[in-house]
């Protein structure tokens, strides 16, 4: 009998053949598939397998074989790279049409001590809260004006970028991404793809590789990029800051919410909360712009400003360190009311499209940061795919600015928003 996974509508199974790649011997019936088995494409359990016709089975099998064995397609688009990412992240990420951390997503739910993959901490509520908070705001369509071509350019830490869109600082291929590619290649894709597009890439650091690999890759990229470090010991951070200055990085970041990192804890590498005095010491140690990431309250944002930092980065680590937290956008208006114009306000949190970018800019952000979509692109296609995704976002941002009457990024204010 023939079966198809009704979730991804791509994986097919013949009971007579079995599937050696997933450990199913010939003759294994669907009802006999072990509970721990997962669809190799979307990661769903056997309950999603339903009987199908021989015709559908053959068509799906032929299409899959052509993709694996045939020549590469002439046109490599986002759909092509997303399909590759779906295979690389099998069991961790379904590469769904909407990346929102909802309950029915492959990444969602408790992991019971296993690595988070690309999902959120606990039950994944904070990850989903990021999406919900952002989509409480709607864009106001305003079209009775003379036509114009929007100017999307802005300046970030003294560098002009083609749009206020940057990447998130990401790392952890071995622990969180099926060890799909080398960590250095992952960083390289993020940095070079951003540079080719005309913006600035960010990279993190992880416990599975030397903690200076990210800044080493920024050096390889001639200093065009930003390394963001976990809140390691103060002594080690000062050493990493010195390296970043030596390599002429654009700026330096510290991922304060990394103090809740399960990956670093599992590796026996301590990470720490940081006091206001420690923040100031880090800022004073370098001539480079410094920002602190992981800020989710106005109180913490004001402490960052008092340290002399050049930027405050509002983030809950993609919902990966604290469950049942607020969505990032929920705190943005209050922080912007106090700090807009005093330092760079950086924001992430389920930002996927140029329409999302315009919303957070209108709420007071200076830069909008994209995470999981760029993660998938760097794994699947390196710099080319990352650059392609940035251009996709830029196209949406251009359209959003035209439709809301924003000639420049500075014209995007709360006047173009409607909130639920």
Predicted features by range, described:
Residues 4, 12, 38:
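The −1 position to Zn-ligating cysteines in a subset of zinc-ribbon hairpins
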Residues 268, 324-335, 377-398:
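C-terminal helical cap(s) of enzyme catalytic domains, especially alpha/beta-barrels
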Residues 126-212:
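N-terminal functional module of multi-domain proteins
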Residues 21-36:
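Short linker/helix segments within small regulatory modules
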Residues 61-161:
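An N-cap/entry alpha-helix motif that binds or orients negatively charged groups
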């Amino acid at each position: 009998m023939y079966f198809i996974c009704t979730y991804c509508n791509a994986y097919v199974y013949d009971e007579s053949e079995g599937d050696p790649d997933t450990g199913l011997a010939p003759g294994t019936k669907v009802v006999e598939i072990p509970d721990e088995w997962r669809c190799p494409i979307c990661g769903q359990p056997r309950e999603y397998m339903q009987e199908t016709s021989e015709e559908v089975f053959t068509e799906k099998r032929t299409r899959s074989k052509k993709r694996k064995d045939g020549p590469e397609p002439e046109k490599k688009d986002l759909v092509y790279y997303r399909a590759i990412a779906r295979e690389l992240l099998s069991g961790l990420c379904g590469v769904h049409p909407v990346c929102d951390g909802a309950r029915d997503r492959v990444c969602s739910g408790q992991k019971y001590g296993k690595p988070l993959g690309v999902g959120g901490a606990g039950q994944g509520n904070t990850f989903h809260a990021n999406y919900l908070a952002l989509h409480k705001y709607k864009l106001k369509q305003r079209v009775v004006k003379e036509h114009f071509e929007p100017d999307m350019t802005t300046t970030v830490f003294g560098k002009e970028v083609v749009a206020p869109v940057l990447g998130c600082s990401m790392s952890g291929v071995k622990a969180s991404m099926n060890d799909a590619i080398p960590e250095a290649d992952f960083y390289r894709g993020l940095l070079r793809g951003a540079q080719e597009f005309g913006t600035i890439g960010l990279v993190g650091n992880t416990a599975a590789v030397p903690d200076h690999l990210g800044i080493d890759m920024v050096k390889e990229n001639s200093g065009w990029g930003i390394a963001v470090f976990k809140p390691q010991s103060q002594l080690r951070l000062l050493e990493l800051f010195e390296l970043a200055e030596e390599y002429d990085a654009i700026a330096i970041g510290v991922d304060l919410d990394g103090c809740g990192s399960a990956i670093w804890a599992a590796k026996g590498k301590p990470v720490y909360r940081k006091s206001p005095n420690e923040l100031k010491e880090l800022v004073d140690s370098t001539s480079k712009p410094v920002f602190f990431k992981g800020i989710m309250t106005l109180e913490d944002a004001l402490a960052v400003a008092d340290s002399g930092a050049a930027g405050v980065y509002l983030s809950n680590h993609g919902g990966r360190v604290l469950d049942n937290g607020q969505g990032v956008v929920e705190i943005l208006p209050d922080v912007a009311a106090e700090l807009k114009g005093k330092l760079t306000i950086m924001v992430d949190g389920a930002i996927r499209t140029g329409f999302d970018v315009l919303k957070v800019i209108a709420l007071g952000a200076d830069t909008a940061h994209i995470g999981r979509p760029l993660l998938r692109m760097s794994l699947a296609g390196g710099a080319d795919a990352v650059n392609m995704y940035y251009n996709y976002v830029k196209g949406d941002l251009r359209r959003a600015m035209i439709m809301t009457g924003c000639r420049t990024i500075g014209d995007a204010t709360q006047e173009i928003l409607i909130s639920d």
